[in-house]
């Protein structure tokens, strides 16, 4: 498919007008009843935010200043995804490979001005790339009770600025076990940090595990869940890899460890089943599609 876009911005004497044609391609092929492969590719444009283009300086603290950049330009994003699904009996899986390239992306930079202040701003840098292979495997349900799933992947980042170049690799995983027997069901889920790197900033994702159990009786459902039952420390954070003003920060939330959650629900969707049955019984078209006339 092909679509177009138009972007216009003007601030005093600065501004831009941009017309774009944005192609998108989707392909798929089924090798057999158990194997299917698909490809998706697209080109898109990203415009700078108005707040980033404002010629305004804001004080962050006694040493840092946030500044806009009215010279920011639209940049181009290229995305490619290749995916394959396969199934054999109780075993199924998915292989996913994605690649993204951004040309002259708007990313951060930090400079030191004549007042010895660190000015944090954005500029059209050289390029940003992300490569992400991922594998997902699933087994079950075994004896109509147990289901196992596991996924793992790698995020590789290449961030090139006008005066910096950073690469970063992150391995991540996610595992889950689900069980269901009669009116009871339970699950255990865990995953580690899935981090993101853009410009000169590394943002750490969440790392947690969860244990849950529920019981269903007719329309009543009672459940409980414990977040991070086996650790006593939960944190999130990030790092700035600027050569003039590097930094690291963490947020510790102890309340998110061994956090107990209870849930009680009641299904009150009465009448819906009766209406559905009536529609099935009366699913008859008696209209012949002609007008009737009579005296």
Predicted region positions:
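Surface-exposed extracellular loop regions of Gram-negative outer-membrane beta-barrel proteins
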Residues: 1-14, 18-28, 33-78, 97-117, 144-149, 154, 230-246, ...
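Transmembrane beta-barrel strands of outer-membrane/channel proteins
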Residues: 2-6, 39-43, 84-86, 95-101, ...
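Outer-membrane beta-barrel strand-turn architecture
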Residues: 21, 27-33, 76, 86-90, ...
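Outer membrane beta-barrel strand-and-loop segments of large Gram-negative receptors
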Residues: 69, 73, 88, 92-151, ...
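C-terminal beta-signal and adjacent terminal beta-strands/loops
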Residues: 217-295
């Amino acid at each position: 498919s092909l679509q177009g876009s138009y972007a216009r911005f003007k601030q005093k004497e600065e501004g831009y007008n941009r017309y774009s044609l944005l192609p998108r391609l989707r392909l798929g092929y089924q090798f057999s009843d158990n194997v299917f492969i698909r490809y998706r590719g697209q080109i898109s444009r990203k415009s700078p935010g108005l707040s980033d283009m404002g010629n305004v300086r804001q004080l962050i603290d006694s040493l840092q200043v946030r500044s806009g950049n009215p010279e920011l330009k639209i940049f181009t994003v290229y995305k490619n995804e290749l995916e394959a699904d396969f199934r054999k009996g109780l075993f199924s899986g998915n292989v996913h490979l994605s690649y993204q390239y951004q040309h002259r992306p708007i990313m951060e930079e930090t400079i030191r001005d004549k007042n010895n202040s660190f000015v944090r701003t954005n500029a059209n840098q050289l390029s940003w790339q992300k490569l992400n292979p991922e594998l997902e495997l699933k087994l079950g349900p075994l004896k109509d009770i147990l289901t196992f799933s596991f996924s793992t992947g790698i995020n590789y980042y290449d961030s090139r600025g006008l005066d910096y170049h950073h690469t970063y690799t992150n391995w991540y995983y996610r595992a889950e076990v689900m069980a269901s027997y009669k009116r009871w069901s339970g699950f255990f889920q865990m995953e580690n940090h899935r981090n993101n790197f853009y410009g000169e900033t590394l943002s750490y994702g969440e790392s947690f595990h969860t244990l849950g159990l529920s019981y269903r009786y007719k329309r009543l459902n009672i459940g409980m869940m414990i977040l991070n039952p086996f650790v006593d420390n939960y944190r999130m954070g990030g790092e700035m890899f600027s050569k003039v003003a590097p930094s690291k920060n963490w947020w510790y939330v102890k309340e998110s460890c061994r956090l107990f959650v209870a849930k009680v629900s009641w299904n009150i969707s009465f009448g819906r089943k009766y209406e559905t049955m009536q529609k099935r019984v009366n699913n008859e078209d008696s209209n012949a599609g002609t007008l009737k006339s009579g005296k």
